[in-house]
Amino acid sequence: FFKNINLSFLTLVVAMLIGDLFIGFYENMIFVYASLLLITFVFYKISKKINFKSLFIYGFVGSLIFFIISNFGVWALGSPGVYDIAYDKNFNGLLQCYILAIPFFGNTFLSTLIFAYPAIFIYKSLTVRSSSR
């Protein structure tokens, strides 16, 4: 929602770091951060085109970006201490990682929609009010 993309990136990284201070840092967090930064960049470029209908599509695309990158990180580095799953470092191992992660995608997409629609509604309401003053 910031006009400056660097401020968007900074806000995202600071919020994630604060959260990770409480939750704990983890080995493949670079993939989570990278996916969120990419999603921020993509949506920064298209933010003027967001409406109620397109948000569903953008939410799906953002969830898919997160799914692909974060699960690649799980395949590449494993998930030590969480599930202790080590995938074979070949195409079959990567495919197995993505297949086993499919049940989590639904929750990612659903939570994206649950939070995105109110956030966009509030943002649009505030920008309409401030522009009418």
Language-model features and meaning:
Residues N51-V128:
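Membrane-embedded alpha-helical hairpins and interfacial helices in multi-pass inner-membrane proteins
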Residues L7, T11-K45:
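Interfacial aromatic-anchored transmembrane helix boundaries in multi-pass membrane proteins
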Residues N4-L12, M16, F52-S63:
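Transmembrane alpha-helical segments and their boundary/interface "anchor" motifs
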Residues F2, I30-L38, L110, I114:
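Membrane-embedded alpha-helical segments of multi-pass membrane proteins
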Residues F1-N4, F41-I50, I122-T127:
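Structural signal for the C-terminal ends of transmembrane alpha-helices
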Residues F1-F2, L21-F22, I68-I69:
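Transmembrane helix irregularities
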Residues S130-R133:
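Membrane-interfacial, low-structure loops and terminal tails that flank and connect transmembrane helices
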